[in-house]
């Protein structure tokens, strides 16, 4: 069998046609483990936010119990920050600068997800904000869809290390991520309309509500953007 041509200066394990791995085997395993640890910590932050939102949308919710849940979100976000730094420090091997840059870009973008989770929780507590009760079901739905999005994103990132060729040939998982983002957009638009139709709310209250809605839905947008980054990364490795 003819071996794939590897241009001079390209580390072993990386082929110009997007081989099954981006790095040499040992380095591939190391970086795979580090970035998946980071994504797990980001996911834990999202799960903590889900608990916070569930408590904030429960009947009779008050601000004091949310303070402790907000603290949990912030602690999880800090852990995700530490994981990001650890992952970046692990990118010290002899592989293509473009690969290093792509991985850092994906990791730092995912870290923004944890940051947004923290923003939602702490700002809601600081401002003692609660979504209008009529919107609670839709807010919960947005969080649920966003979690599904992130689960798919985590799987797609993992495939970069173990099923690279498969992902190059069939990136339907990235389309699924974008499809879920469209679902979030649809629910977001409905909530926008719902809020501005509430005669009992002052304009300032409506603007505050849609501002928090924007921040919450930004998480879904970031996940979609990371999916786009992955697809660009794949395209750049096809010759």
Positions of predicted regions on the chain:
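Short, Lys/Arg-enriched N-terminal segments with co-localized hydrophobic residues
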Residues: 3, 8-21
